[in-house]
Amino acid sequence: MLAVRKARRKLRMGTICSPNPSGTKTSSEVCNADWMASLPPHLHNLPLSNLAIPGSHDSFSYWVDEKSPVGPDQTQAIKRLARISLVKKLMKKWSVTQNLTFREQLEAGIRYFDLRVSSKPGDADQEIYFIHGLFGIKVWDGLMEIDSFLTQHPQEIIFLDFNHFYAMDETHHKCLVLRIQEAFGNKLCPACSVESLTLRTLWEKNCQVLIFYHCPFYKQYPFLWPGKKIPAPWANTTSVRKLILFLETTLSERASRGSFHVSQAILTPRVKTIARGLVGGLKNTLVHSNRWNSHGPSLLSQERS
């Protein structure tokens, strides 16, 4: 989903990981878990902003807690409705937009992660949680899962895009940034010129993690990249035709230098969409009914492209 330079330059991805019995990989076997390490040498010195990098939307939302309070990202009307029995079960069907854990996404080749976070009412430990209507797992648990993968795959580079913050004051931000530091340590890549970042330079510095932080708080830490360095225009439509047109237009209009660019190939349900498919949920209402064709990927956040 992070499409930089040419969205149509697709990376040739193989099986998630299917080594042959001898334990070695043949030239025809590409392990998605190590696809960056497997790129041909002539791409190692190419700026990362010239690669098309797969990503996921609401990356953390493979699990949400229907027993938790409704998140601060929801309106008061939704919060009042949630007092009714079964409403949160229905909310869960529309809040879950992924079916793979962080680890499973990484092993499948995903390298860009769309992250929304929040404090939780009544939580005395100042923990920060992922949020999408309902609260997900603790951010710390997700970061540790990602770091474990990176330690085992030292040539893979990831983009963590913290783009929505809810119910967070300065203390919460400091807690979150400390967690990020504790989780990744020297793997964090300091903010610098986008054009200077290549696979080779990152490998030489043992850097694997770029953190984008859409909040002025980024100025206090050298390893936090400003959100403006990774714009992510949003089509906000249920129409596949309008989405494709939007993606083509925004890609052609993006800045040629100085930033990455996210192409959000996702359909967004409207209120009437949710009302019509209330019980069926996102997967049955949008994902199954909208496909490119028999040869193309789904546009929905339920699947990655």
From Swiss-Prot:
CDD domains: PI-PLCXD1c. Widely expressed. InterPro entries: PI-PLC_domain, PLC-like_Pdiesterase_TIM-brl, PLCXD1/2/3, PLipase_C_PInositol-sp_X_dom. Its main location: nucleus. Gene3D superfamilies: Phosphatidylinositol (PI) phosphodiesterase. Keywords: Hydrolase, Lipid degradation, Lipid metabolism, Nucleus, Transducer. It is found in: Nucleus. SUPFAM superfamilies: PLC-like phosphodiesterases. The active site is at H57, H132. GO terms for cellular component: nucleus. It catalyses: a 1,2-diacyl-sn-glycero-3-phospho-(1D-myo-inositol) + H2O = 1D-myo-inositol 1-phosphate + a 1,2-diacyl-sn-glycerol + H(+). Signal peptide: none annotated. GO terms for molecular function: phosphoric diester hydrolase activity. Residues 42-215 form the PI-PLC X-box domain. It comes from the Eukaryota. PROSITE patterns: PIPLC_X_DOMAIN. One of its GO terms (biological process) is lipid catabolic process. Coiled coil: none annotated. Catalyzes the hydrolysis of inositol from phosphatidylinositol (1,2-diacyl-sn-glycero-3-phospho-(1D-myo-inositol), PI). Could also hydrolyze various multi-phosphorylated derivatives of PI, such as phosphatidylinositol-4,5 bisphosphate (PIP2), releasing inositol-1,4,5-trisphosphate (IP3) and the protein kinase C activator diacylglycerol (DAG), therefore mediating cell signaling. This is PI-PLC X domain-containing protein 2. It comes from Homo sapiens (Human). The gene is PLCXD2.
